[in-house]
């Protein structure tokens, strides 16, 4: 098809959006310069550049989807306005990322709030590659694929996906296809955003690092945190024989009871190590997932079984603790920390692959996408993304039980 042979008038605000038409062809722009688009010919979509036109990008039942896209076009993103101990955010226009090989562009519908975001705002959360000057916040996102790059075979436009991604709090993201997880059919975008990072973290800690076997006992500190609750769910899903969850409040105890935790320990009034040894008749806990750190290290070593595994996931209670080297050696314990910050893109993709391998609805080729209700994330609050600062303040207050999710408009 000649790109100028079928022309119809169209008004366009040159911001990321989609429209539909029953007429195939090229749309005349009211902007004179720098339009980029896709020409839809018999051989399929192909890129072209023009100074006057935009074009359809896909066709379905004689309805054509167009993408209004201008060279240098801007989108909205939430960026760090200042780095300090309190959140400083601004919703600004930024240039969208270029789409590369084996990547997809996702129109973001929701992104969750994570504790690592608070460190990011404070300027203390760095990773491989450093921190860009105008940093877009957010570590995850859920949305719809709107563009597919060369070499992507498992996904198509219109697929609903979730991903761990730097800068997720934006109208669009570009992400490697290897980092994508399909959203189960019985989940919303909000649930996808709430789940993806927590499940990646919990699965990597519990299944990959601690090598949990069927029937083993698992203790999860700060079990009412986002990662903690999803670790509880995965421990049950993968056949833990005993699940112990710790919290410091009666509200937290009630929530953990509802999640099916076998033994809830309120550490504000009960000694964790003593109680863990009591309920295991002295044998101890096989796997301890620790989100607290600090003084909990010595309790974990006391509570651990011979050949137990202690996995440090977070340091809410501090980065330093007392280590009993004699007990560590006597029990032949494994003590290991996990983080995403020093992992390469390939290493993160391997974590995604392991999660998709072990939970069938997360596979791109899954015949059935409904996921078991026991794995549904707990959501405490949903806010519009222009209230991101309020969301971070709510998280800082430590009063929310469940994930806080921002809907992206």
Located regions from the model:
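Low-acidity, Ser/Thr- and Arg-rich intrinsically disordered low-complexity segments
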Residues: 2-13, 17-22, 28-29, 33, ...
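Glycine-rich cofactor phosphate-binding loops and adjacent beta1-alpha1 units
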Residues: 257-336
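Short helix-loop-beta connector
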Residues: 186-188, 211-217, 282-283
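N-terminal glycine-rich beta->alpha transition that marks the start or flank
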Residues: 85-87, 94-142
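A glycine-/small-residue-rich N-terminal strand-loop-strand element
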Residues: 142-165
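C-terminal hydrophobic helical "lid"/dimerization subdomain
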Residues: 72, 347-409
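Mid-domain Rossmann-like dinucleotide-binding core that forms the NAD(H)/NADP(H) cofactor-binding site
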Residues: 193-269
């Amino acid at each position: 098809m000649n790109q100028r042979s079928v022309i119809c008038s169209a008004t366009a605000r040159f911001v990321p959006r989609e429209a539909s038409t029953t007429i195939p062809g090229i749309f005349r722009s009211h902007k004179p310069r720098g339009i980029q688009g896709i020409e839809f010919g018999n051989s399929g979509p192909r890129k072209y550049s023009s100074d006057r036109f935009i074009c359809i990008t896909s066709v379905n039942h004689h309805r054509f989807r167009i993408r209004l896209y201008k060279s240098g076009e801007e989108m909205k993103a939430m960026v760090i306005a200042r780095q300090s101990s309190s959140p400083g955010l601004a919703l600004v226009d930024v240039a969208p990322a270029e789409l590369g090989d084996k990547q997809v562009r996702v129109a973001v519908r929701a992104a969750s709030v994570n504790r690592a975001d608070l460190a990011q705002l404070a300027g203390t959360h760095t990773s491989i590659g450093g921190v860009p000057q105008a940093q877009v916040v957010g570590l995850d996102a859920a949305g719809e694929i709107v563009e597919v790059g060369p070499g992507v075979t498992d996904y198509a436009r219109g697929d609903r996906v979730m991903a761990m991604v730097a800068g997720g709090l934006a109208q669009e993201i570009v992400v490697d296809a290897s980092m994508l997880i399909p959203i189960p059919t019985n989940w919303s975008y909000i649930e996808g955003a709430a789940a993806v990072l927590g499940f990646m973290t919990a699965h990597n800690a519990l299944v990959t690092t601690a090598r949990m076997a069927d029937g083993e006992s698992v203790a999860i500190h700060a079990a009412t945190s986002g990662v903690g609750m999803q670790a509880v769910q995965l421990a049950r899903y993968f056949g833990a024989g005993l699940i112990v969850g710790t919290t410091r409040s009666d509200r937290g105890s009630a929530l953990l009871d509802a999640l099916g935790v076998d033994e809830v320990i309120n550490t504000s009034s009960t000694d964790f190590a003593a109680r863990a040894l009591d309920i295991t008749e002295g044998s101890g806990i096989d796997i301890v997932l620790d989100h607290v750190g600090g003084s909990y290290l010595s309790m974990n070593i006391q509570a651990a079984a011979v050949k137990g595994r202690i996995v440090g996931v977070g340091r809410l209670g501090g980065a330093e603790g007392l280590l009993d080297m004699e007990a560590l050696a006597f029990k032949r314990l494994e003590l290991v920390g996990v983080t995403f910050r020093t992992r390469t893109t390939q290493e993160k993709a391997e974590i995604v692959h392991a999660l998709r391998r072990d939970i069938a609805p997360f596979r791109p080729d899954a015949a059935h996408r409904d996921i078991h209700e026991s794995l549904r994330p707990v959501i405490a609050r949903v806010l519009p993304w222009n209230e991101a600062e309020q969301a971070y303040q709510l998280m800082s207050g430590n009063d929310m039980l469940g994930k806080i999710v921002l809907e992206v408009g």
